[in-house]
Amino acid sequence: MATLESRLAEMLKVPVEALGFQLWGIEYVQAGKHSILRVFIDGENGINIEDCANTSRQVSAVLDVEDPISTEYTLEVSSPGVDRPLFTAEQYAAYVGEDVKVQLTMPVAGSRNLKGAITKVEGQMLSLNVNGKELVVALDNIRKGNVIAKF
């Protein structure tokens, strides 16, 4: 069975791309009565507030018709930002050599939180250099992953 996020991504990909943007990813966070649906978009020239507002209107219209979420939620549309979340193998592969932090469902090397440089991505497996040690993590074990911004 597909996750809610994957069903939403499938539903929203075409309308977002029709506006000229890439659907970077989706997060749905249930927090009691105040759930949040975050839709991340990206574009060749970046994203501005007007892009987010236009995309929000389009996404909201699709969600109103399809009604995939039965509870109340707040819709947020934004750029992934400098500490962008990573959702797919392709996104992780694009950041080989960069530092990331990942939160895991099941511990690897005794930890559910890892920080390290991506050394490679093969299929659905991510290799990280964590404090000089090579660790391999299945992408489906990653609850959340983000690029660590360098300033």
Swiss-Prot record:
Species of the source: Shewanella sp. (strain W3-18-1)
Matches recorded under NCBIfam families: PRK00092.1-1
Main location: cytoplasm
Keywords assigned: Cytoplasm, Ribosome biogenesis
The protein's role, per its UniProt record: Required for maturation of 30S ribosomal subunits.
Family: Belongs to the RimP family.
GO cellular component: cytosol
CDD domains: YlxS_C (cd01734)
Subcellular location: Cytoplasm
UniProt protein name: Ribosome maturation factor RimP
Gene Ontology BP terms: ribosomal small subunit assembly; translation
Pfam families: DUF150_C, RimP_N
